[in-house]
Regions:
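An N-terminally biased module of ancient metal coordination in phosphate/nucleic-acid-related enzymes
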Residues: 1-79, 162-164, 176-177, 182-259
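Extended substrate/RNA-proximal surfaces in nucleic-acid metabolism proteins
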Residues: 2, 58-212, 268-275
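A short acidic, helix-capping loop that chelates divalent metal ions and anchors anionic groups
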Residues: 94, 259-260
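Structural recognition of alpha->loop->beta junctions
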Residues: 210-224, 262-282
Length: 282
């Protein structure tokens, strides 16, 4: 896949803490990143920047560089897309107001998911998911509770059986528009990156249409290397990045040490020919 040697600097620019749907506190996340050899870490919690201050302090203690980030849920052509913002100012008022609105939607959706579980004879699932969440309840908290109770063997099975689109307890939502999400990220001084793009299973034509919209609105990057991409998908995303003039990012999308498919700092190197998102960082 191009560069076989490990890069001199290890970047992991997509991770989650207990401020959203990760299981580790921001401090524990940073400590694990340092143990795993990560040099530059971005915390990109879903629709939330609450973990930034704690992570900044932990990164200073651990001696690694911290990039304040965000992962925003976007609705585009009735599809859920995740957009990562890197280098955002968590105190930006316009972005924070947008995130407040998104978290309110998450809360409403969680209640509706809980009602669906009750309807199929599982009335304790909503309360259990709430107990696992430090903040807003997400589908991942429902999945973690189902694993905890032995209903499913792992988080992936919980999604496949109950929580993904088309399953019994799935609830759709109208998230932020692509235009709004990129406006918030840019207004907060950040760079907008398409998260785990191969996961969306779009046709080539539709994906190019999305990337055109994304770039026109100011998007600059695409996650080429991430835990959910195999080597073929990473190579394909690298080709899209070069075709569309987008920078390449790399991130594990880490949520939990128990998720063996998404280990913190364990990301394939970028394929040759990619321009990394960090190329102009100081």
């Amino acid at each position: 896949m191009g560069n076989k040697a490990l890069p001199s600097i290890c970047y992991d620019l997509h991770s989650h803490s207990s401020a959203s749907d990760g299981v580790l506190s921001p401090t524990a996340l940073v400590q694990l990143a340092a143990e795993n050899g990560v040099d530059v870490l971005a915390l990109t919690d879903h629709d939330c920047t609450d973990g930034h201050a704690e992570a900044v302090a932990a990164a200073a203690e651990a001696g690694i560089r911290f990039i304040p980030g965000i992962e925003i849920s976007v609705s585009w052509h009735k599809r859920l897309i995740h957009v990562v913002g890197l280098g955002v100012d968590g105190n930006n008022s316009e972005m924070q107001q947008g995130l407040v609105d998104l978290r309110a939607k998450r809360t409403q959706r969680a209640e509706e998911i809980g009602a669906k579980f009750t309807k199929i004879g599982m009335p304790d699932v909503y309360e259990g998911a709430c107990a696992l969440a430090d903040g807003v309840v997400s589908r991942s908290h429902f999945a973690m509770y189902l694993v905890q109770q032995g209903v499913v063997k792992d988080v992936q099975q919980a999604f496949k059986k109950y929580l993904q689109q088309g399953k019994r307890c799935y609830v759709g939502c109208e998230w932020a528009s692509l235009e709004d999400a990129l406006k918030w990220i840019h207004g907060a001084g950040g760079q907008a990156v398409v998260a785990h793009p191969a996961r969306y299973k779009m046709s080539r034509t539709l994906f190019r249409e999305f990337l055109i919209d994304f770039k026109v609105l100011g998007g600059v990057g695409i996650e080429v290397a991430c835990s959910s991409h195999n080597l073929e998908e990473a190579t394909q995303m690298a080709a899209y990045a070069q075709e569309m003039g987008l920078l390449a990012s790399a991130g594990s999308d880490f949520h939990s040490p128990d998720n063996t498919w998404a280990k913190l700092g364990r990301v394939h190197p970028l394929p040759e020919g990619c321009q990394p998102i960090w190329k102009d960082w100081d």
